[in-house]
């Protein structure tokens, strides 16, 4: 059995919960969730009235009447809810088409079964309104009795009668509005008559009465007026009620918006009831019994007030429909159609903001000391003045909240009564529905923002005041207690002394009744020795009364009794000729009036949490039963575009207004208000279900739009950050500004991890993360998709897009938990499990089908450009995917800017492209591409090229000696031209053969350039890695200083960065192994100087295995000199062909094939080891040497000699360069360790003349 816990311990344990730190630092930009605390209801509805035996009996009786009237008002509220939320049942029931229909009996039976409970409710409603009118008129009759007319009637009683008047007005309007009620009753009646359910005359009569009651408009009002007019002097009592409402309204003696609007409705409907055949309000005004000009002023200021739900009432309508309006029309300004400034919310915003700022600052001071810092003193240590300040602060806060909520509802009401049209708003279509014209098209941008801001202020302040609820509650109870006790024990002591002394028994009995009702004496009873009780003066030493201090409020009955009894003392009416007021002294009257006025708000403040909720309740912005009724069944429910909460939320999202972005959740909270109201006040599950369905849809839309915006915003931010600053400034000089994105407040929204909506806790951050991840993936997918639909030059744009996405990912990762960028990229690149991705495949695809056959390399610029004369077919690519700007560079302006940047990379393939390819493909991708390129080279060298080599070898002259210098360059040219005639005239040489060689050359060049780019990347890697591997640059030392000492200091400085020892000390075995391997690999890479190009050349050498490349063994055992059997002689012949200058309109071999052709030829020669004999025995070089010597210029067989020689010289330089590069790579494997070349000695050749002898 657990040990017993005392109440004190339990309470202290609960208090300790406040000390618990809550983990998240989520910014508060949403209203408070529904409280899990109980809201205690201290209102006993006078059930405890009989306990106050010491009170004046008359007021206890009045409390009894009050109690039953309050119950009737509650019942009236239930009927109002029933009527307002009534949905037509008969529309859903199948109709009987004709009398011969076989299942009509069944249909009628079902109709009766379904509708009977509903019709019973209507019947009860009819009885209720009958009873309520009788009850009300009975009270009026009692109070207007000639004997009672001068009697005092309490304000509370008059206000209750006013509430009755309001109830009748509301019920009548609801009954008038609901056609579906009448339709349902008619359907029931038809079915019941057919089934002969109503056989007895009484039920038939009742049914008929109900039909008439429902059919007659204003039936309740008419009945009420008829019954009131037979009561003599009824208008006097109604005048009292109206005057009280005017007084309350003028002095702001109301707290919740519904109380304020009730006062106005009672004024209007009260005047309507008074102005009939018996009495005339204008005569009463003339007698100063009522003040119509004041009421007119109020009705002018506030022309439309909420009646019930989305039903509104124009207050002037009560006046316009009254009996004597026409002849007094000119007296009313409220009846004119001009709009009141009250409804221009934008003008009111300055004042609202000022009030908000002032109050929030004041509240923050108290909040910080009470709640946040915990430095607030213990409750018992506060002074009365401090409690009073908190009390005033609570009241002021509630009044502000109520004022703002009322303001929102009044603007909304005005708009519902005054829908827009196509003339007032050009965006409003002709066929717009009534509700749509009242909501969707009826607000300007400024008005929507103003509403959003006010709603945010209301809900934000509600949060702050809710947090201080316990502090406020204690201060309120303490202050109310102190005020009541001080007033009853101290302030009323002097009037009591006077009353006893002057023997004013009535006043004495009332004052003593008050004291007995509320006094909480320190000793437990009234001091017996108090001289005031004997009507004597206090002794000179004074009579000290100690008033205790507690935090206990009075009960509702207690407060009512005290206020009513005090009121009876200062009232202008009294049962006798002389009023009690005249017997009291001036200061006493002022004290009583002051206390009476202040105590008006005590009931509200004692129920602080409930009042706070009522003052912030904006639930009616969603309900639309009245407008649904107007559609006559065409609409079951309106779409979200017409729903106020979504209109405001969507407006913030659509305008992307930064200052409003943090308010977006407050607009969504309107659904919480409506759902709470539907369940707790309307008690209608179907309304809650409709709200829930709308919330599901709206929240999806909200997350979808918000995530899209956030992604687009950060994408533009990334695009702007990475955009070349020089381009931006250049554009600015040209007058085209590329704007940076305006700052927005998405961070606060991204930190929301538990948004409260309809009782669900939603992790907004997670939902946005999901959407943004999808958008990120789509962006990467699109970037790769664009690359796949373009040629190799677009690889630079791909890299740019990936960098922007990487930056976007980095910016978003501050707030969202996204997958790593590399993981996303691999997924988009289809490279998670596959060995190579889409980019690698497309790079090879482009190389194979477009780059190798169609690009010409220029060694001077180190670039490939597209050939002027393509030999391959046009390559068909996929269509480029369409994309919105946020999936590319961010915005249209950025897309344009980046397109112009990447446009300069479009017409060539060079180092920038190769660097990007290296980065994107990585070692694995490069290896795959090179392997595939080697296959291409192999198929060409062992296929078509080999065939051409064989064919051309056959048409080569068997022997072609180099002629002697004496022949002169023209002669030599003619000799070679004649010797190589078959080669020169070979048609396919300059087309297919050269094209195939160009492809081989381009492939080899691609490998070479990739390796050069890769080396740059590697060096960069190595330099970045150096500090972490203890590889430090040698330090500069002055003379006389020791290097090793300085290096040691430097090493110790960088020791914390040295990764391997660090991991060995702190890491797991697996981490240690990885670190060691990584370190070793990086160092090895640095030392080895590995060459990939050498491996590629070695591989290509193995492809040249056919004997035709090398020819037969030389007959002299050394080398072939004059015979044309080796490849280098064939290449010399080819070189002779392309060195012949072309005609004016023909393309040169450089234009058609670029340097790739020469790279292919020279590479084959070098790999065959024929480069030196080629340099010595080449036909063109020989011609060059001779021409250089004799300097002749002739045209031999249409070939200008000098021009040809110039071309030969150019190609000689190119060949030498290529052969040197290739030699360097091939010899790099031999290493530096073999400085001595291997020399083979041959016998010197013997001249023929000597050989024979």
From Swiss-Prot:
Taking the first listed entry, what is the main subcellular location of this protein, grouped into a coarse class?
cytoplasm
Effect of altering residue 725 to E?
Answer: EIF4E-binding reduced by 70%. EIF4E-binding reduced by 60%
Molecular function terms from GO: actin filament binding; profilin binding; small GTPase binding; translation repressor activity
State one Pfam family annotation: CYRIA-B_Rac1-bd
User: Which superkingdom does the taxonomy of this entry point to?
Assistant: Eukaryota
Documented effect of changing residue 726 to E: EIF4E-binding reduced by 60%
Give compartment(s).
Cytoplasm; Cytoplasm, Perinuclear region; Cell projection, Lamellipodium; Cell projection, Ruffle
Q: Supply the alphabetized keyword list.
A: Actin-binding, Cell projection, Cell shape, Cytoplasm, Developmental protein, Differentiation, Neurogenesis, Phosphoprotein, Synapse, Synaptosome
Q: What happens when the gene is disrupted?
A: Mice display greatly reduced lamellipodium formation in response to growth factor stimulation or aluminum fluoride treatment. Abnormal epithelial morphogenesis in vitro, and cooperation with oncogenic Ras to produce invasive carcinomas in vivo.
Q: Which GO terms describe its biological process?
A: axon extension; cognition; dendrite extension; lamellipodium assembly; neuron projection development; positive regulation of Arp2/3 complex-mediated actin nucleation; positive regulation of lamellipodium assembly; positive regulation of neurotrophin TRK receptor signaling pathway
- UniProt-reported outcome of changing residue 726 to A: EIF4E-binding reduced by 20%
Q: How does it assemble?
A: Component of the WAVE1 complex composed of ABI2, CYFIP1 or CYFIP2, BRK1, NCKAP1 and WASF1/WAVE1. Within the complex, a heterodimer containing NCKAP1 and CYFIP1 interacts with a heterotrimer formed by WAVE1, ABI2 and BRK1. Component of the CYFIP1-EIF4E-FMR1 complex which is composed of CYFIP, EIF4E and FMR1. Interacts with FMR1 but does not bind to related proteins FXR1 or FXR2. Interaction with EIF4E stimulates FMR1 binding. Component of the WAVE2 complex composed of ABI1, CYFIP1/SRA1, NCKAP1/NAP1 (NCKAP1L/HEM1 in hematopoietic cells) and WASF2/WAVE2.
Q: Which family does it belong to?
A: Belongs to the CYFIP family.
What name does the UniProt record give this protein?
Cytoplasmic FMR1-interacting protein 1
Organism name: Mus musculus
